[in-house]
Swiss-Prot record:
This is Sperm protamine P1. One of its GO terms (biological process) is sperm DNA condensation. Protamines substitute for histones in the chromatin of sperm during the haploid phase of spermatogenesis. They compact sperm DNA into a highly condensed, stable and inactive complex. One of its GO terms (cellular component) is nucleus. It is found in: Nucleus; Chromosome. Residues 1-69 are annotated as: Disordered. It comes from the Eukaryota. Residues 1-30, 37-69 have a biased composition (Basic residues). The keyword Chaperone does not apply. Testis. Belongs to the protamine P1 family. One of its GO terms (molecular function) is DNA binding.
């Protein structure tokens, strides 16, 4: 049974990421329903996205340097 648990958790994480992108669009359009929740969740998601972007930039820069050398 332990083998099936990681596969389920991975599939759930992928579905959650897809659902969050859709929910962000709907929440941005409907700020009147709950502005406080949007600011709190939006800030956390923005930070995670910025960190991921920085990591990708660092990896791309390292690859470029290796190619030049």
């Amino acid at each position: 049974m332990a083998r099936f648990r990681p596969s389920r958790s991975r599939s759930r994480s992928l579905y959650r990421r897809r659902r969050r992108s859709r929910r962000q669009r709907s929440r941005r359009g409907g700020r009147q329903t709950g502005p406080r929740k949007i600011t709190r969740r939006g800030r956390g998601r923005g930070k995670s996205r910025r960190r991921r972007g920085r990591r990708s930039m660092r990896s791309s820069r390292r690859r470029r340097r290796r190619r030049r050398n």
